[in-house]
Amino acid sequence: SGFLPLWYESVVFQLTRMPPDIAIERWICCEYPGLRDIQRRAIAEQQAKAAAVLSRDIRRMTPRKVYEVSQVMNVAFFKLMEPVTGLRLTGPYDRSPYVLRGGELADLADRLERDDHEGDVALIRLWAEALGLSGWIEWRRLDEVEAGTLH
C-alpha cells in the first residue's frame, strides 16, 4: 500500500519524539510557571486530536501494529502529562486495550527520568523494545545521515 511508508514514518516519528517531549514539557512546567496555562491548553488540544483517532473507522484503515503502538504511546504520554497539566488526559483511553501497556511505558519513563540526550535515547530504546519496534529504528551518527533524510 502507498500508505505503508507514511505509517512507518509516523510511528518512528512518534517513538523518537515523545520521550524528549516528555522531558521538555516537564522542564517547561518547572522552570516557567507563567506558561502553565498556555502549556495546559496546548497539551489538552494535542490530547483531543489524539483521542479523535480512537474511532473504529481509523482503526480499521490502519495496520494493527501501527495503530496499537501509536495508541499505547499516546496513553503513556498523556498519563505523564496529567501531573504537568492537572488535567485528566487519559479518560478517553479508559476502556481501551492500550491502558495497561501505556501505563507500563509511562512507568519506564518515570523510572528512567533523565533530562539529557542520553536519557532520551535510553527511553526511546526501552519504549522500542517494549513495543516490539527495535527493528524499526537504526541509530546513526549525524555524519552518516544522508542530506534531506527526515529520520
Task: Please give the residue ranges for each predicted region.
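Post-HEXXH active-site segment of zinc metalloproteases
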Residues: 1-18
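Pan-zinc metallopeptidase signature
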Residues: 33-151
